[in-house]
Amino acid sequence: MPTVSVKWQKKVLDGIEIDVSLPPYVFKAQLYDLTGVPPERQKIMVKGGLLKDDGDWAAIGVKDGQKLMMMGTADEIVKAPEKAIVFAEDLPEEALATNLGYSAGLVNLGNTCYMNSTVQCLKSVPELKSALSNYSLAARSNDVDQTSHMLTVATRELFGELDRSVNAVSPSQFWMVLRKKYPQFSQLQNGMHMQQDAEECWTQLLYTLSQSLKAPTSSEGADAVKALFGVNLQSRLHCQESGEESSETESVYSLKCHISHEVNHLHEGLKHGLKGELEKTSPALGRTALYVKESLIDSLPRYLTVQFVRFFWKRESNQKAKILRKVDYPLVLDIFDLCSEDLRKKLEAPRQKLREEEGKKLGLQTSAKSGSKDSDVKMTDAEASANGSGESSTVNPQEGTSSEKETHMTGIYDLVAVLTHKGRSADSGHYVAWVKQESGKWIQYDDDNPSMQREEDITKLSGGGDWHMAYITMYKARFVSM
C-alpha cells in the first residue's frame, strides 16, 4: 500500500496509507477523521483532475511518498452543552418526584386503605401542609396531650416523605401513633387488623390537628384547621307541639349529604342534611318533645368537605350496611342558596365580580379565535386560590403584587379530591383516593399504586353499583379580588 502526505491549509499530514483495493471514498473518510472536512467537501488534486469517490487507483497512478493537495472547509466543532444533560435515572429521588408532578403511594399494612386514602386527600391541601411544617414542640399548646403531639408530628413527617419519594412509602410510624391515639383502629378479627371507616379516620385526624395547630399565643390564625375546613351553621329549632322557637350556632368540619329515594344529586342531599328532627326538653311542656331543626351556612371554609351518608346500622345483620343509590356530584359546586341571609348579602358583590371576570375571559377567548392580539388569557383571580378565611381576607391572592385589594369568597367551589369506597359494607371493601394535582391532572391513589385518570372518570364515581363510589368529596373555594 502506498504511503502519501496530504497538504491541507497550513498543515501537512504525513504517513497516510492508501489501500488501493478500496475505492477513493474510503481514503476521503480517513481524511475526514484527520481534518474534519466531510468527503463531499474535499477537493483532492491528482493526475487528471480531482479525485472522484469511485475513481480507479490504477488509472490515477498514485505513488509511494507522493504529495497530494486537499482543499475544503471542516465542520464546526460541536460544543459541549452549557448545561449538562441530566437523565431521569440520574436524578435524586426528591427531584424525580417533582418532575413526575405527583407524590408517591402508600403501602397497605393490612386493611389500612381507609387510612391511606384519608392521608392522600388531606395531603393535597397546601395550607395544611404549611401549618404542619411550622409545627414544633415549642409551638405545642399546653392543653395538647402527648399522643396528639405525636400524631401531629407523624402526619407532618409522612406528608414530607410522600413529597420527597417516588417509591411507595410505608406509613408504619403514622399507623402506630394513630392506633395509640385512637385504639378503635387496633381492632382485630381472626388475628388481622379489621377494615375501618375512612370517614371516622378523617374526622379523628382533623380533630387532633385542630387541637395541635392552634397557636398558643397568637390570635391571628389561631385555629388553622377551623380556618381551612370549619363551617359555621346557624340553626333554628321549632317545637311542633308547643310552637317554641330557639336558635343556636355550631361549627362543623363537614356537611352531610343525606341519601333517600328522593335524592339524585349532591345539592339535594345537602338540603336534606341541613334539615332534621331531634328530641330535647321543652321548657313550656316540661318534658321531652320533638323539634324540627333547620340550618343555614353562616360562614364558609376554604375547603368544603362533604360526607355522603351511605352507611347505616342494619340490625338484622348487626353491621353497617351501604346505600348504593347513585348520587351525582358536580365538578363545580355553588352553595349560595344554602347560606344564611346575611352571608348571601356579603356574597352578592363578589359573585357579580366573578361573573364579570368570567364573561370577560370568555370574550377574550372568543377574540383570540378570530385573530385578536390578546391570545394569551391570564387566569382570573376567581380561579386562583387565596389564603384567608370567612368571607374576606386581607391576604393578596398573588403574592408579590402591589395590589391592595382584598380577596373575597364567592360561595362557588371546585372539586379537588374524592375518597371512594368499593364494596357492600363500611367494615369491608376497599377505599381509594382520587386527587387533583396543581397541574389540573387527576391521580388515583390506590394504596401504593398511583395512576393518572381523566376528569370525566371522576364524575363516574357517583354510585349505583359495585364500582368505586364517592364517600367523601372535598371542594376548594373560588375567590375574587375587590
Swiss-Prot record:
Residues 350-407 are annotated as: Disordered. Residues 172-191 are annotated as: Calmodulin-binding. Residues 104-478 form the USP domain. InterPro entries: Papain-like_cys_pep_sf, Peptidase_C19_UCH, Ubiquitin-like_dom, Ubiquitin-like_domsf, Ubiquitin_CS, UBP14-like, USP_CS, USP_dom. Its EC number is 3.4.19.12. It comes from the Eukaryota. Recognizes and hydrolyzes the peptide bond at the C-terminal Gly of ubiquitin. Involved in the processing of poly-ubiquitin precursors as well as that of ubiquitinated proteins. This is Ubiquitin carboxyl-terminal hydrolase 6. It comes from Arabidopsis thaliana (Mouse-ear cress). The lineage of its organism: Eukaryota, Viridiplantae, Streptophyta, Embryophyta, Tracheophyta. The gene is UBP6.
